[in-house]
Swiss-Prot record:
Protein name, entry field: Defensin-like protein 151
Positions of disulphide bridges: 35-88, 48-68, 53-82, 57-84
Domain of life: Eukaryota
Annotated GO CC locations: extracellular region
UniProt-listed GO biological process terms: defense response to fungus; killing of cells of another organism
Protein family membership: Belongs to the DEFL family.
Source species taxonomy: Eukaryota, Viridiplantae, Streptophyta, Embryophyta, Tracheophyta
Family matches, as InterPro entries: DEFL, Scorpion_toxin-like
Keywords noted in UniProt: Antimicrobial, Disulfide bond, Fungicide, Plant defense, Secreted, Signal
Main location: secreted
Signal peptide span: 1-29
Subcellular location: Secreted
Protein source organism: Arabidopsis thaliana (Mouse-ear cress)
Length: 96
């Protein structure tokens, strides 16, 4: 059987490891990630207004970058739409 001081040290070590794990998990959950959203207001029919796209994306998130791109990987096919890329929280809400 272990001595009481050894048991206390073992229990303390376990709690310290658990506390560090919880802190790391909370920190990683708050780390910014890149989000993407197609903004329909800048895309009208077969055209996309690049200035309006950039401005709407900046309104969504201060560091957002808006570009007009086609929905498909082949630029000659498909209609252009406003793609907004921005930093967001883990729940998808943008950083302001």
């Amino acid at each position: 059987m272990k001595k009481p001081s050894q048991l206390s040290a073992t229990i303390l070590t376990i709690f310290v490891i658990l506390a560090i794990g919880v802190m790391v998990k909370e920190t990683l959950g708050q780390a910014p990630s890149t989000c993407f959203e197609a903004l329909k207001d800048a895309s009208k029919g077969a055209s996309c207004d690049s200035e309006l796209c950039a401005s709407l994306c900046k309104k969504k998130s201060g560091g957002g970058v808006g570009t007009c791109r086609t929905k498909t990987t082949q630029p000659s096919k498909g209609q252009p739409e406003c793609h907004c890329r921005f930093w967001c929280k883990s729940d998808g809400t943008p950083y302001k």
